[in-house]
Design a protein with these regions (language model features):
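Residue-level recognition of the GNAT/N-acetyltransferase active site
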Residues: 80, 113
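Short amphipathic alpha-helix that is part of the acyltransferase structural core
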Residues: 1-34, 51, 131
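Conserved GNAT acetyl-CoA-binding A-motif
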Residues: 93, 100-112
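A conserved beta-strand-loop-helix scaffold within acyl/acetyltransferase catalytic domains
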Residues: 36-54, 59-78
Length: 139
């Protein structure tokens, strides 16, 4: 029986353990604590999750920081490993892009691994050709 999915716009305490399970399987999020994750969620402007209605499980997630005018930055696009290849990555990103806090922004950006570039290019993202370099400083 095919699954049906529901979009949610918050991750409360009742679903936090499910987000932590998604985070546990990704290299960039696997060391986050519950407290750290709660603070991240609180500081995010947009939170989108996709739940499987059959078992009420969070199977896809993304979050955004935005000034609502010039820039929005998408973080933590994750699809559960057992649900990949079903269009959920595209669906969660589409939900982000259609969110009222994002859809009128001039430029939406994200980080991704090189192997995911074609996936994001199919959704209209492109690599900057302006010679811009990402700079980072740990505090």
């Amino acid at each position: 029986m095919p699954s049906t999915y529901r979009v949610i716009e918050s991750v409360g305490d009742e679903r936090l353990h499910q987000l932590m399970e998604l985070y546990r399987h990704e290299w960039w999020t696997n060391n986050r604590t519950i407290e750290h994750t709660q603070a991240i969620l609180k500081g995010s402007d947009v939170v989108i999750g996709i739940c499987d209605e059959a078992d009420d499980r969070l199977v896809a997630f993304a979050r955004v920081l935005t000034d609502r005018i010039a820039r929005a930055f998408i973080f933590d696009v994750i699809v559960a490993a057992d649900r990949r290849g079903r269009g959920l990555g595209r669906r969660v990103v589409d939900q982000v892009l259609e969110h009222p806090a994002v859809k009128s922004v001039e430029l939406v950006e994200l980080y991704c691994r090189p192997e995911l570039v074609p996936f994001y290019e199919r959704m209209g993202f492109s690599s900057p050709d302006s010679g811009v370099v990402l700079m980072r400083r740990r505090l």
